[in-house]
Amino acid sequence: MTAKILGSLALFMVASVAQAKGLIMTPPVSSFLITQKFVCQASNNHPTKTAQITVQVVDFNGEVIQEKSVDLAPLASTWTTPLDGGVLNPDLPARCIIKSTNVGSKRLAGTAAIWVDFHVQLAVPAVAVPQ
């Protein structure tokens, strides 16, 4: 029983770290917990179709703090937006929600699904150096 619990906990921790690093993609909606400023980058790997992407920063009451939409051009175009999630409240961090309105979650045989890769990178805060 203890081994089963530890195994489940380890799997949860690995999945959480992978999602935080942007390694797990779950279109059409990906959600990342943020506690400081961050940058979001998306790459559209479809050769002819445009991906429609909306990035929102919301608090846990569902209120939208910031929102930006973009049509991401074909052929691995990239888009980076400096959305300022900030630290609204150390005990109540915000959440970044990335929505893609026309992105397929998997490639199907005979279809040309749009595939978008998301990466969320936390900005490193400046550190004051004593004089």
Task: Describe the role of every protein-language-model region.
Residues Q19-Q131:
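Gly/Pro-rich, tryptophan- and cysteine-flecked surface segments typical
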Residues L11-Q19:
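Hydrophobic h-region of N-terminal signal peptides that target proteins for export
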Residues M1-G7:
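Bacterial N-terminal signal peptides that target proteins for export
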